[in-house]
Each structure stands twice: as C-alpha cells, then as structure tokens.
Amino acid sequence: MNASDASMTVIGAGSYGTALAITLARNGHRVVLWGHNPTHIQALQAARCNQAFLPDVPFPDSLQLETNLAHALAASRNVLVVVPSHVFGDVLRQLKPHLRADARIVWATKGLEAETGRLLQDVAREALGETIPLAVVSGPTFAKELAAGMPTAIALASPDSEFADDLQQLLHCGKSFRVYSNPDFIGVQLGGAVKNVIAIGAGMSDGIGFGANARTALITRGLAEMTRLGAALGADPTTFMGMAGLGDLVLTCTDNQSRNRRFGMMLGQGMDVQSAQDSIGQVVEGYRNTKEVLALAQRYGVEMPITEQLWQVLYCGKDAREAALSLLGRTRKDETAKL
C-alpha cells in the first residue's frame, strides 16, 4: 500500500476500532489501523487478527497495521477515531500536528468529555480548530457481530453535507452494514452517551432479580430522559427514536455483550463498584457518563430521575434496591409530561 492511498485511517485498535477497520476493509477499501501500544499493533500484524477481542476474525489483505502515528495519518484524509471518551480530547491533540491539510475527522466514540460533560463536538473543535470537517457515527453495534459480518445498522451525522455523503458511501455495505444519514449532529452524539447510563440501570434491575417488566420500564423511561435532555440541548426529538437513540438503548439494555449492562448486573447482585469494574476488564463508559450526564441535565434544568438514582449508587454508595424503590415511590404524574 502506498503512503497516501488509503480510504480511511482508524485510530484505536480495541475491539470496536478493529471491527470497524475490518468492516471497511471487507467493503473493498484500503484501511490503516493505528493503536497507541506498538507491542499490541505488532501482535495484531503477526497474527493478522485481534486475538484479545476478535480471535476468530482474520484481517482482510487490505487492512494495514501501523505503529507510527505520522505515517498512519499521512495515509488518508479520512480519520476515524475510536477511543474511550475520557481520552478523546487528549488523542485529538496528539493527532493534530500530524494531520494532512485536507484531513476530515469522524468518531465512533460514545460519551461526553470527562469532568466537563461537554459534547465531543466541542472537544473536537477546541482541539482541532474550526476548519476541519467533523462527523460522528453511532448506533446499535457490538464489535463481535460487526466484525463477523452480521447485519448491522448505524446513524451518521455531520454539519458538512459533503463529508456526510462521502462517509455514507464509504461505510455502507449492502450485504451487512447499513448507514443512515441524520442531520442532527447533537442528537446522534447525545444518544450514545445517555444509553450507556440507562444500560447500567437495566443491568442493575436484572441483577436484583426484578424481571422483564422492570427492565422494560427502565428502557422506556430512560428514553424519555434521553429525549428531554436532547430537546434542551437543541437536538431533534425524533433522532432518539432512531439508531442512535432507541436502537442503541435497546441493544445495550438487553444483551449481555454490553459492558454497561454486565456492570449493572454485578452491582445489582451486591458487588461493589470497583470490583465490578475490575471484573469487566475494559472501560465501562457508563460509569463516567452517569456523572457527566447528570451534571449536564442539572445545568439545563432537565429532570432525569433514573440517572440521578444511578449516580447515587455509583458515587454515593446507595444500595441498588433502595434506589429502585426511590424511583417507584416518586410522585404520580402524566407519562407524557415534559417529553
């Protein structure tokens, strides 16, 4: 592969970044995959698969591994960032000096900035300046299923219509990967952050043993919280009925491939927060997102009772069953009020 003929450079060689790189390469594109740990990248190159996360999925020939960041970024103008939300800003600042003059940035990171609760678009603008085109992809995607070529659909949003069109064409594969465009840049970002929080609650409910009725109620009222917060931030409420909202919410609340759900289940079964995180062994985005989403809601005066109770459990030591009873004991109200 020549240094400047790749369709996409993927930053982040974890399970999801690898799965997206495989999907792009399988679609017939030349792809460069870079990760921060050279030893890990060298192991991927030697095995031609990600043995840690996706051991049964061989890399297509058109997927190139790269340990040198400057070389990886020189290979393509299109850069897909797939890193945890708490390091998102740091990674973009690391990329900035090496980006091509015509670079365009899209991310699959789901969450808000650690501590500040800012949307990732604001973090990206601060790190990269005002001229680089930005986009986000989000939706119901488990890395193992995506890498295996199982049917998957996501949403894509960008303020730059040309970039959005190019990305949709680049990512879309009629055989297995469907990409819906969405003009709501804020909503597509926010859905991926809030669903992480609600998934912890759904897992916690199941861990306690409350059953399907309670889980479904949490999903439904969690969607209401997501929609209220989105409306306050200027998002289109209909976005939350799509892939980046309801789609991702249902997936992560109901399937044990979700780290957030498994984390919540452990808490519901009586495990402490640190032990549950250690047991998962990977980043649980919803843990940090809970604090950040609640702070954002309070800033905008949005009521989010599920998120608030989860914050009490995660950061104040409240018992999970007691938190559930606090939600059930709230004042009676109209289901559709302030949606």
Curated annotation (Swiss-Prot):
Sn-glycerol 3-phosphate binds at K110, G139, T141, K195, D248, S258, R259, N260. It is an enzyme of class 1 (oxidoreductase). Pathway: Membrane lipid metabolism; glycerophospholipid metabolism. The keyword Ribonucleoprotein does not apply. It is found in: Cytoplasm. NADPH binds at S15, Y16, H36, K110, A143, R259, V283, E285. Its EC number is 1.1.1.94. GO terms for molecular function: glycerol-3-phosphate dehydrogenase [NAD(P)+] activity; NAD binding. Keywords: Cytoplasm, Lipid biosynthesis, Lipid metabolism, NAD, NADP, Nucleotide-binding, Oxidoreductase, Phospholipid biosynthesis, Phospholipid metabolism. The active site is at K195. One of its GO terms (biological process) is glycerophospholipid biosynthetic process. Transmembrane segments: none annotated. It catalyses: sn-glycerol 3-phosphate + NAD(+) = dihydroxyacetone phosphate + NADH + H(+); sn-glycerol 3-phosphate + NADP(+) = dihydroxyacetone phosphate + NADPH + H(+). The keyword Magnesium does not apply. GO terms for cellular component: cytosol. Gene3D superfamilies: N-(1-d-carboxylethyl)-l-norvaline Dehydrogenase, domain 2, NAD(P)-binding Rossmann-like Domain. Catalyzes the reduction of the glycolytic intermediate dihydroxyacetone phosphate (DHAP) to sn-glycerol 3-phosphate (G3P), the key precursor for phospholipid synthesis. Belongs to the NAD-dependent glycerol-3-phosphate dehydrogenase family. This is Glycerol-3-phosphate dehydrogenase [NAD(P)+]. It comes from Pectobacterium atrosepticum (strain SCRI 1043 / ATCC BAA-672).
